[in-house]
Amino acid sequence: MEFFPVYYAGQLQTLSSSYGNFAFNWFFHLLKNEVRLKKNAITKTFLTNIYNMGYKELLLECQKLLNEGDFEGMIKKLEELSKMEPSSKEEAEESLKLLDFLIEEVKKRQEEIFNKMVNYQKFKNYLR
């Protein structure tokens, strides 16, 4: 199976308005950074299946797990998407909006973590 390449922040232009594989890939890139997953590669087929399905209920569960800081649990929930049956177009569109929200939430968490690391480094340098 072909693996979907990972894109980095500098290559991403309009995250909030894009929903295609690019946005999904960025979302998983953030998650993989957060839980340090090395073995679980996200395949192109998996991303395509997610894109073509209605998955609002699972995304709501993912949002709950994200709020609890359970990133590994969130990945497991997202993997369930590959087993779902296609749903209505309307539900799929609602799900995409929710995914966009989750992308933004994960992005905020990444910024918070980065800022904490920077502040810690400044404090360490100050003590020297």
UniProtKB/Swiss-Prot annotation:
Report what the protein is called: Uncharacterized protein aq_1570
Recorded superkingdom: Bacteria
